[in-house]
């Protein structure tokens, strides 16, 4: 993920300040050098890095920490505020009628981003439509149509036309009933004059309310020139950063934001249309520093529960807080967890669970955990209705039968039963809580954000 190395290395450096009530110049120098190293390796512009370093050094040594604040927390707060300032505000995207035009080089992820954004708007109660104007790239129409179908949104394109400007004009007319028009434009392998001329013509027809530059997180220092030319041509209002699930460094996209004096609008990761989120600087840096993001976590949980309930109208997640917790319920929770997205992203949103704890886990921990969950589902397929309803009734002979039927080891069947028992006990604790108790618990988790945690319901 973008700047992930910075988060990992900085957390380790800040941990060396634990137990100190005062901070020395040597301590600050060590933290600042770690920030410089990580940002420069992430392709952030050197001038930005130097400005940030100077500000952190000055504030850390001159500002008096509030009473009772440790040296680590004092520096952490300053680093947090300065990094939030570095990434900038979020691009305003009002939930109202509007036209958005996407620009960028070929391969930056514009077509996928158009579908993801359309899906996002649809979940906010608006009716979006994608207008595909790319007549340059082979297969562009087919890809866009397929992605729009996955997002379940309106789509317009003309596969036999070679006039992108006319397609844009016709597309807006054909989808006039839509609240939000997302116009996907053609890219090239480089910034060519014909690309700039074409996108300027489309802009004249579309008259977008905002133009977003789509950037691959791996763009590197080339982002500066690209951003400058697109901004001079059509004016860039915001940036959508894509492919954050890869090993990309991501700093070049921050450079582009600074170069165009714009902001970040969306972050994209993964191949599905749901793999998108609005950029929230506070939440982004909070996750980066291992402090969690309860707001984003809550939104993902609510969305995942809704999607899981849509798949099975007889299942109501509120029933979990009332009666017995069965294996059916556990399975639905696992499906909801899967709907939340990659586990490592979810973990980063839990205060005390991301950050330092994630650094300590093996690189394949998330893959192993998801594989175990898939194994659990296979085991449940081999269980009877009575066993699913009352797992406590499952004895040794039944474990042997279930293992044979599922092709899973007997130990894995026992592991599932133990996992269910642990989750059932957790649900009982929640059942006894009032709203005030829940809020106090979540507040405590937020306060403990940087301090590490343990386990994830026994899954690790």
UniProtKB/Swiss-Prot annotation:
Q: Where in the cell is it found?
A: Cytoplasm
Top-level taxon of origin: Archaea
Q: Which EC number(s) does UniProt give? A: 3.6.5.4
Question: Which keywords belong to this entry?
Answer: Cytoplasm, GTP-binding, Hydrolase, Nucleotide-binding, Ribonucleoprotein, RNA-binding, Signal recognition particle
Q: Which Pfam families match?
A: SRP54, SRP54_N, SRP_SPB
What is a single molecular function from GO for this protein?
GTP binding
Family, per entry? Belongs to the GTP-binding SRP family. SRP54 subfamily.
Q: How does it assemble?
A: Part of the signal recognition particle protein translocation system, which is composed of SRP and FtsY. Archaeal SRP consists of a 7S RNA molecule of 300 nucleotides and two protein subunits: SRP54 and SRP19.
| Entry protein name | Signal recognition particle 54 kDa protein
List the lineage, top down: Archaea, Methanobacteriati, Methanobacteriota, Stenosarchaea group, Halobacteria
């Amino acid at each position: 993920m973008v700047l992930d190395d910075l988060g990992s290395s900085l957390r380790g450096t800040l941990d060396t300040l634990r137990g100190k009530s005062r901070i020395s110049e040597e301590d600050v120098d060590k933290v600042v050098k770690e920030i410089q190293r990580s940002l420069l390796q992430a392709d952030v512009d050197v001038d930005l890095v130097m400005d940030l370093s100077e500000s952190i050094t000055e504030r850390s040594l001159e500002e008096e920490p509030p009473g009772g604040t440790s040296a680590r927390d004092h520096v952490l707060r300053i680093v947090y505020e300065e990094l939030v300032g570095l990434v900038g505000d979020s691009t305003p995207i009002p939930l109202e009628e509007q036209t958005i035009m996407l620009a960028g080089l070929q391969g930056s992820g514009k077509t996928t981003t158009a579908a993801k954004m359309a899906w996002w708007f649809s979940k906010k109660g608006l009716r979006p439509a994608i207008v595909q104007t790319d007549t340059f790239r082979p297969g562009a129409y087919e890809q866009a149509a397929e992605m729009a179908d996955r997002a379940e949104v309106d789509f317009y394109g003309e596969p036999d036309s070679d006039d992108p400007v006319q397609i844009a004009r016709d597309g807006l007319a054909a989808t006039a009933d839509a609240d939000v028009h997302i116009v996907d434009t053609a890219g090239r392998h480089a910034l060519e004059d014909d690309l700039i001329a074409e996108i300027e013509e489309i802009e004249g027809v579309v008259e977008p309310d905002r133009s977003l530059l789509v950037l691959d997180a791996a763009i590197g220092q080339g982002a500066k020139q690209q951003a400058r030319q697109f901004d001079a041509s059509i004016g860039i209002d915001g940036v959508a950063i894509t492919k954050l699930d890869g090993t990309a460094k991501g700093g070049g996209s921050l450079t582009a934001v600074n170069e165009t004096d714009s902001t970040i609008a969306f972050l994209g990761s993964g191949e599905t249309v749901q793999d998108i989120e609005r950029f929230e600087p506070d939440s982004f840096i909070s996750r980066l520093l291992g402090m969690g993001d309860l707001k984003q976590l809550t939104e993902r949980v609510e969305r995942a529960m809704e999607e899981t309930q849509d798949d099975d109208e007889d299942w109501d997640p509120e029933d979990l807080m009332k009666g017995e917790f069965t294996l059916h319920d556990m399975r639905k929770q696992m499906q909801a967890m899967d709907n939340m997205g990659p586990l490592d992203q979810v973990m980063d949103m839990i205060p005390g669970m991301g950050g330092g704890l994630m650094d300590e886990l093996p690189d394949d921990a998330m893959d192993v955990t998801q594989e175990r969950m898939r194994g659990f589902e296979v085991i449940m397929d081999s269980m009877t209705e009575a066993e699913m309803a009352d797992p406590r009734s499952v004895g040794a002979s039944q474990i042997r039968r279930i293992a044979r039927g599922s092709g899973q080891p007997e130990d894995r069947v026992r592991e599932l039963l133990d996992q269910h028992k642990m989750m059932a006990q957790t649900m009982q604790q929640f059942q006894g809580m009032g709203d005030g108790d829940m809020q106090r618990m979540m507040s405590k988790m937020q306060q403990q954000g940087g301090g590490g945690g343990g386990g994830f319901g026994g899954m690790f």
